[in-house]
Amino acid sequence: MKIPILPIVALLSLLALHAAQGAALGTPMEDTTSSNYPSGTEGLSEFLNFNKLQSAFKSDDFLNWHVLTDMFKKALPFINWEFFPKVKGLRSAVPDSQ
């Protein structure tokens, strides 16, 4: 079974950036609060751990490829990361000298 990693990573990064920017800047169209939603979504937020993602995007290591790959490996431990040779190969690559 193939799991589309790129769309999942893009969606998670957009969600983290959206939450980090304080959501919408204007007034809401309707009164929607977290109390309107069932409490069953708490498990999902603990699974995705948005606070950890926000802290990763605010740090100085935001553009560090190794930190980003380690963050996603820790956030998604159920994916077999050894299956992706490009991700595994980038960890051992020597950085380009400029």
Swiss-Prot record:
Key words, A-Z: Differentiation, Secreted, Signal
GO biological process, alphabetically ordered: cell differentiation; epidermis development
Localization: Secreted
Signal peptide: 1-22
Top-rank taxon: Eukaryota
Induction of its expression: Up-regulated in suprabasal cell layers of embryonic and adult epidermis.
GO annotations of cellular component type: extracellular space; lamellar body
Tissue-specific expression: Ubiquitously expressed in stratified epithelium.
Membrane-crossing residue ranges in chain numbering: none
InterPro entries xrefs: KRTDAP
PANTHER family cross-referenced by the UniProt entry: KERATINOCYTE DIFFERENTIATION-ASSOCIATED PROTEIN
Function of the molecule: May act as a soluble regulator of keratinocyte differentiation. May play an important role in embryonic skin morphogenesis.
Protein name: Keratinocyte differentiation-associated protein
Lineage of the organism: Eukaryota, Metazoa, Chordata, Craniata, Vertebrata
